[in-house]
């Protein structure tokens, strides 16, 4: 039996089409995925992301523990509320999960991890935390709502108290603050400005209804996927998993190689991959008719004249751009063009950086 978030009833009242998403009943859309997508790019939309897991870590050695657990380095986190994106890797350098870590005090950090990987994440974290005497609290008492779009912060702020408005005033991206009973973070998964707001479960339904009244459009998983793909953001299980290195998933920037004496899980394997060479994640654009879909083969001839083949990890029609885009994992050495096999047709595609839209504007 699939689980329900505290907002399940609100979704049905808003006319959502519900689907089972990794064991959670979640809204796919509320009538028009396209309208929801455009609302986030041009105004404000909101997503129930309460299926994600918030994990609080307490203990005097929490920073030391996270410097070992994560490929990125929490030594960078010195300002209260600052957030960091990182992979959590296994010994062979594969990605167990990608997550966000927040720093509050030396003995209090917070992780936000994916729903699909919840059980293995918690098991892995608990196993490795033991020598560091970390107190781990899974915050199943909290719901999480993402409000995203150019007008999202302004509309969300109409629900805040004076204290909360003051707390978020001038807050830069990738920060979070606890203000009253809300944890408000300037993070998201759409390429737009906005907030991700955690609150007690019993407050979530009222907060959702108030956002609807403030003119924020409910959005489902369908729009969430096209928005994150336009923004070039990875989806766990597609761009990366336990068998795929962050180096092959456009996550090289999340690996803190310095200081060289910091030991983190997967470091040795990554150093070997870096020396030997590895696959890369690229963007693909197809302006001709048709849609680039997951798992389609991508072919190109490298500089040595050898035929090479990769695979599309995520593909869709881009509502913002009006043509098809994709992320693809390919061997090193791809040029500016490639061929994608769609049924029995070979379609030419342009190879780009793996990001297509930022703040509502085309970058590909």
Swiss-Prot record:
The reply on keyword Ligase is no
State which residue ranges cross the membrane.
Answer: none
| Listed GO CC annotations | cytosol; glycine cleavage complex
The record's catalysed reaction(s) read: N(6)-[(R)-S(8)-aminomethyldihydrolipoyl]-L-lysyl-[protein] + (6S)-5,6,7,8-tetrahydrofolate = N(6)-[(R)-dihydrolipoyl]-L-lysyl-[protein] + (6R)-5,10-methylene-5,6,7,8-tetrahydrofolate + NH4(+)
- Tell me the InterPro entries matching this sequence: GCS_T, GCS_T_bac, GCST_C, GCV_T_N, GcvT/YgfZ/DmdA, GcvT/YgfZ_C, TrmE/GcvT_dom1
One Gene Ontology term from the biological process aspect of the record: glycine decarboxylation via glycine cleavage system
* UniProt entry keywords in alphabetical sequence: Aminotransferase, Transferase
Q: Does the keyword Glycoprotein apply?
A: no
On the tree of life, the source organism's domain of life is Bacteria
- EC numbers for this chain: 2.1.2.10
User: What is a GO molecular function of this protein?
Assistant: transaminase activity
Q: What does this protein do?
A: The glycine cleavage system catalyzes the degradation of glycine.
Assembly information from the UniProt record: The glycine cleavage system is composed of four proteins: P, T, L and H.
Q: Which protein family is named in the record?
A: Belongs to the GcvT family.
**What's this protein's name?**
Aminomethyltransferase
Name of the gene this protein is made from: gcvT
